[in-house]
């Protein structure tokens, strides 16, 4: 009898272990995520972001270095901007506090490496994942003396960097502009590129793309808007005796092998905000041409 009881206990134990192992294996299989859809070029997910064709929810990971969390006001205005221009029924925010990488400056390659290490939100089911990193280090190649500083950049279809330390420094340069103003404008501008603007995954209804010098000194389309006062407008920066844009060299240093959809300069944001402040307006909006483009690609307005 005792032997029979022992046999039953052994059978139950083996069955339990087997079930637990199978359950664990199933869980691991279910939680595995295909990250490839979040590693595409800037603008490749424009329609997916704007419309509800494939995804009805945006999950945005706000990854920030301790002490460099974006202001609540900026994030509220940013999510309002997304609701205004996309058909997403739900926008979820996931805050991830990170330790400092202890770097004096960051290149896009270093930023991408940090994303690989720290990102937790990806596309899954009907949810589209976005990653935004708020750093405590400026961009490689910044030149404070010449006023050439980078506030943010998009470098993949769902990836963005905001140089929060530089955002805060820029906000101190004007008594009429605060930290939230600079954060909001930077976030909205860079996300405009994830919308596919300008001609960066979302086709132009009418030609309104501005031009700037490339490395060879030729004027080429620069994926920004040529309409005055538009959020997606980029101001050219000249600071050398030859008149060649200093931004060309600093951008090449910053990109370091990774192509950026946009490297947003402090001068551009400061000019946009000061123009709007002079008109008594607090926010910088998309112009009519950009609105036409995103509507044609599945956006709201």
Regions from the language model: what does each represent?
Residues 22-140, 278-283, 287-301:
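Propeptide-to-catalytic entry region of secreted or membrane-anchored zinc metalloproteases
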Residues 59-61, 131, 159-161, 230-231:
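Generic structural signal for residues positioned in beta-strands
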Residues 1-8:
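Bacterial N-terminal signal peptides that target proteins for export
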Residues 15-18:
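C-terminal motif of bacterial Sec signal peptides marking the signal peptidase cleavage site
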Residues 79-188, 194-217:
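Metzincin-family zinc-dependent endopeptidase catalytic domain
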Residues 174-275:
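The catalytic-center signature of Zn2+-dependent metalloproteases
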């Amino acid at each position: 009898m005792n032997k029979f009881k022992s046999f039953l206990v052994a059978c139950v134990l083996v069955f339990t272990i087997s079930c637990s192992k199978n359950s664990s294996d199933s869980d691991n299989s279910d939680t595995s995520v295909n990250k490839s859809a979040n590693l595409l070029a800037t603008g490749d997910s424009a329609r997916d972001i704007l419309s509800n064709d494939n995804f009805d929810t945006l999950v945005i990971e706000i990854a920030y270095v301790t002490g460099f969390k974006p202001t609540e006001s900026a994030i509220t205005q940013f999510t309002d901007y997304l609701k205004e221009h996309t058909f997403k029924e739900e926008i979820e925010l996931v805050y991830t506090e990170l330790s400092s990488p202890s770097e004096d400056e960051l290149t896009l390659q270093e930023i991408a490496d940090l994303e690989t290490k720290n990102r937790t939100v990806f596309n899954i089911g009907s949810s589209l994942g976005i990653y935004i990193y708020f750093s405590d280090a400026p961009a490689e190649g910044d030149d404070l003396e010449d006023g050439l500083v980078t506030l943010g950049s998009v470098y993949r279809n769902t990836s963005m960097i905001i140089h929060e330390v530089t955002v805060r420094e820029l906000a101190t340069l004007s008594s009429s502009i605060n930290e939230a103003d600079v954060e909001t404008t930077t976030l909205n501008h860079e996300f405009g590129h994830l919308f596919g603007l300008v001609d960066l995954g979302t086709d132009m209804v009418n030609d309104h793309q501005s031009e700037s010098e490339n490395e060879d000194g030729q004027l080429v389309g620069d994926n920004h808007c040529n309409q005055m006062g538009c959020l997606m407008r980029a101001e050219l920066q000249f600071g050398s005796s030859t008149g060649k844009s200093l931004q060309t060299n600093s951008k090449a240093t910053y990109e370091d092998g990774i192509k950026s959809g946009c490297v947003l300069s402090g001068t551009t944001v400061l000019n946009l905000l000061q123009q709007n402040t002079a008109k008594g307006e607090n926010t910088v909006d998309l112009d009519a041409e950009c609105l036409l483009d995103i509507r044609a690609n599945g956006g709201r307005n």
